[in-house]
């Protein structure tokens, strides 16, 4: 089989359509799956010895949240090292990273796999992976044809990364130096709320403004602070963390501003405070609402004049520190109640950010679950950790009062429970492995129990034949319209019909 000019042109056109990189990448992956008649396809970006999914088709949604470290995925490592088309034999001993992650085929393992590394010059920037359930599924395509596909995808990905880099540099102050070597914090989520938050982080990071990050407990406020710091001109300097809620009043001032020898009992030497440690960098004050009014006044002075005094010292020290503060309280209400200084609130909230709770983030819960599943897999040395359909349904309907932190702990606990009840190193998380209270799931549709007169394979094929016949009849035997009605692509429908003996 050879690609026609029309096929290649169609792929190129899809890469120019859409309003953003994510949309273009999704169109590319969907088109490739149709052209190559594969069961699953994915576009991955390479970063710091791991592959990060950018777009998928035919794979479980939680794949978008997973981070595939090379040391934990030998097939992906082979693709990264190859420099050319990689075809894995059906009997390859290397585990496929997508085993159990094709919806409806969780118990089956992928048979055919092709990997296409993507390069910008000599630099690896990503990969395309193509998977199928039939061992010889990609034999009809030559390496040269697959290289053409890889070249188109590499060009699109390279341009997207270049535009991203230029946009980031354009937001920097004129005298700022790009810092490409800094690893960027991964903020997982594609929901509207998270997309907007990422845009706001990108905007404010390039400035030197103080930022007030608000959100419920467990939403990831510290991660937001890290993302701001790492995307700022201060990224080459330290990010210093201080939890204000954990500070006893007796040592709080010393922790913030330092002390000199003999300033108080136990001060046996000079000690720098968090502000000195963060000089030329960023200081993250978590739970800022817990500071006493006396300390709030001293913090306000630092923000106003940029100098500090160590406890027991009359001299002032100049510091250049950007302050990021976080709270799970409504500081406006705290100001009205007299528990928080209004002038400090206005100093801190020059650019306020709000982190949405997990219950408002839609399918992000599945992406995050995939991320935590992959973390558990690596930590426990398992070959795979996947979510069953029932587990995904449960996660999507639970409200998570503890937000992302609660989800993380729930996944870790479920993996441990599932591992204890299953032999081997493969774990499938079922709904019963989660101990969520008061979860109301949509009621299942009632169905009569049929009398079994044939084996499971025969019953499945009979059902598929009848479903296809009915769909064809309703669509005047138009296979494309039939495929749309059945919510599958036409190439897969033709292959299924042939296997069922409905087509020559």
Curated annotation (Swiss-Prot):
- Which residues participate in ATP binding? 215-222, 278-287
Q: Which GO terms describe its molecular function?
A: ATP binding; ATP hydrolysis activity; DNA binding; DNA-binding transcription factor activity
* Matching Gene3D superfamilies: 1.10.8.60, 3.30.450.40, Homeodomain-like (1.10.10.60), P-loop containing nucleotide triphosphate hydrolases (3.40.50.300)
Q: Which UniProt keyword terms apply here? A: ATP-binding, DNA-binding, Nucleotide-binding, Phosphoprotein, Transcription, Transcription regulation
What's the short name of a Pfam family annotated to this entry?
Answer: Sigma54_activat
Q: In which pathway does it act?
A: Nitrogen metabolism; nitric oxide reduction
* DNA-binding region, residue range(s): 479-498
- Signal peptide range: none
The segment(s) forming the Sigma-54 factor interaction domain are 187-416
Asked if the record carries the keyword Kinase, the reply is no
Modified positions (4-aspartylphosphate) in chain numbering: 57
InterPro entries (alphabetical): AAA+_ATPase (IPR003593), GAF (IPR003018), GAF-like_dom_sf (IPR029016), Homeodomain-like_sf (IPR009057), NorR (IPR023944), P-loop_NTPase (IPR027417), Sigma_54_int (IPR002078), Sigma_54_int_dom_ATP-bd_1 (IPR025662)
What does the entry give for GO biological process?
phosphorelay signal transduction system
Q: Answer whether the UniProt record assigns the keyword Transcription to this protein.
A: yes
- HAMAP family hit by this protein: NorR
Q: What does this protein do?
A: Required for the expression of anaerobic nitric oxide (NO) reductase, acts as a transcriptional activator for at least the norVW operon. Activation also requires sigma-54.
Q: Which NCBIfam families match?
A: PRK05022.1
Q: What is this protein called?
A: Anaerobic nitric oxide reductase transcription regulator NorR
Read off the lineage from the record.
Bacteria, Pseudomonadati, Pseudomonadota, Gammaproteobacteria, Enterobacterales
- The gene name reads norR
